[in-house]
């Protein structure tokens, strides 16, 4: 950037007028003008000593920066778009597209199969938990049977048994009800999490399939690689259903613990 020459009055010494304030300015760089000598004039002009104009006025700085930003940013975006288009053409022509298609279909298929199997497992456990609660609650709140205790009379045994059953009737239903509520909350959390994963898998699959595109796949080797990849994914998913349930269980426990 071009600096502005310091403007000093005719009666000033350039070394005192400019270089005393800005040490990097050489005394010969000052330009003397036919202006009467005054200390106020030198004090006003001292900031102009070889300082770039863009740093002296904020609006000039903003103007320069905005023009630079518009030029550089648009050129960068244009270059980035050209690069992405070239990468897209290269991607469509190469063997990376079948891999992306395979990953998208694997996400979709794995979310659907693993999630459905684990949902069925959760429903079975929930039914067993509900039957356990239904079988246990009448015991807690129903009429109690006296439990004989050695060293106590019959009335003391009956009163002791009645106190024990009343304490269970007060405590057990609330504890079991809170456990059932917690279990239902976990199931609802997992269901929403599974729905989110399923929607994400569908979106990725459709994006890879439609945007990057099956119409651009070359016939022959790329299509055969895609079909081979798909068959391997389906085979591994069908063989490893138990491991998928275990994996979904670990993910579910990790997600609910956080």
From Swiss-Prot:
Query: Which residues does UniProt assign to the signal peptide?
Result: 1-19
Q: Which UniProt keywords apply?
A: Membrane, Signal, Transmembrane, Transmembrane helix
Q: List the disulfide bonds.
A: none
The topology of this chain with respect to the membrane is: Multi-pass membrane protein
Q: Does the keyword Nucleotide-binding apply?
A: no
Q: Name one GO cellular component term.
A: membrane
Location of this chain's protein in the cell: Membrane
Q: Where are the transmembrane segments?
A: 94-114, 197-217, 219-239
What is the protein's given name?
Uncharacterized protein KRT10-AS1
Organism field? Homo sapiens
Report which gene this protein is encoded by: KRT10-AS1
């Amino acid at each position: 950037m071009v600096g502005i020459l310091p403007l000093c009055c005719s009666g000033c010494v350039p070394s005192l007028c400019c270089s005393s304030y800005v040490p990097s300015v050489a005394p010969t760089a000052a330009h003397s003008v036919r202006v009467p000598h005054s200390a106020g004039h030198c004090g006003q002009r001292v900031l102009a000593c070889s300082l770039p104009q863009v740093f002296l006025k904020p609006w000039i700085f903003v103007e320069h920066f905005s023009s630079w930003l518009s030029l550089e940013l648009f050129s960068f975006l244009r270059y980035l778009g050209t690069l992405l288009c070239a990468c897209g053409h290269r991607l469509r022509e190469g063997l990376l597209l079948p891999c992306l298609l395979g990953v998208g279909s694997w996400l979709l298929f794995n979310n659907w199969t693993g999630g459905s199997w684990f949902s069925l497992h959760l429903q079975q456990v929930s039914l067993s938990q509900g039957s356990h609660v239904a079988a246990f609650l009448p015991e807690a709140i129903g009429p109690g049977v006296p439990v004989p205790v050695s060293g106590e009379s019959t009335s003391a045994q009956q009163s002791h048994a009645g106190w024990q059953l009343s304490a269970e009737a007060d405590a057990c239903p609330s504890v079991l009800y809170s456990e059932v509520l917690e279990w239902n909350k976990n199931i609802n959390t997992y269901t929403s999490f599974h729905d989110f994963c399923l929607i994400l898998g569908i979106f990725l699959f459709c994006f890879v399939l439609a945007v990057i595109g099956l119409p651009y796949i070359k016939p022959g080797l790329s299509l055969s690689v895609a079909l081979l990849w798909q068959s391997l994914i389906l085979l591994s998913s069908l063989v490893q259903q138990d491991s998928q349930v275990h994996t979904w269980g670990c993910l579910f426990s990790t997600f609910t613990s956080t």
